[in-house]
Curated annotation (Swiss-Prot):
Reaction it catalyzes: N-(4-oxoglutaryl)-L-cysteinylglycine + H2O = L-cysteinylglycine + 2-oxoglutarate
Protein family per UniProt: Belongs to the carbon-nitrogen hydrolase superfamily. NIT1/NIT2 family.
Recorded name of the encoding gene: nit1-1
MF (Gene Ontology): deaminated glutathione amidase activity
Segments forming domain CN hydrolase: 13-268
Name of the protein in its database record: Deaminated glutathione amidase
Amino acid sequence: MIRNSKILMNKLKRIGLGQITSTNNKEDNFRKCKEMIEKAVENKVNLFCLPECFAFISGGIHQFESRDNAEYLDQKGGIIERYKDLAKQNNIWLSLGGFHEKILDDPNDMIYNTHLIIDSNGVIVCEYRKMHLFDVDIPSKGVKMNESKVVKGGNDLVVCDSPVGKLGLSICYDLRFPELYLSLRRMDAQILLVPSAFMKSTGEAHWKPLLQARAIENQTYVIAAAQTGDHHSKRSSYGHSMIIDPWGKVLHDLPDNLNDIAFVDIDLDYISTCRENIPVFNHKKLNNYKI
């Protein structure tokens, strides 16, 4: 099933997302994502977004599995080269959210969690390395993860020009830090991309309200491609990939356990309308806030 919303069809900017259940089988993950990209192309999507861990998710074997399966961005015959070829062959832009990137000569053998934007010529035009790492222990919810054990945090904010508008890049746990998105908005972001692999317990409580808050606060579209379902016996993701407009209206909410795509046609003028109606960025007292 393919889901479509049309908004102000006079100026088409079509953005899509895919919701998948990745595993530690890279070839199977690539096949699923390739099929989704081809569906998106059939539906004339300009930018298609995949979730965090689209290429690989740990099989629960050991804590260094993601590191051991990481690749360099320019690795010959690597997974990113294959996605670059897909983008070029299909004349589509891709948002690849959350790729395990090897770091050349890192003394601690760390990796990055990297969000890439690939243009329709198959060229990487933007790279964002996840800034906020998921180090939490919530015994009552059965949640424990120490991402910084293998992942090195990035430091740079990234806003990327694209055919659908200015994209503000982030990954998953970044969603809990509104200062990041405020900064992206101040860098003229019009669309916030939040590829994720939220756990079920935290997703049920916080996923939707956090996404809506980021859209409303910054008066931007939010495109949140998510992992869903059981990846292995010890890890499940919440799903509910969402597309939210600058007024906070949820345009798409894909059900849990559904591997599918959704897309919307947006008009960037609607962003301007929302910002003119409630000009919060003109009213902010940034010099008064100690953040």
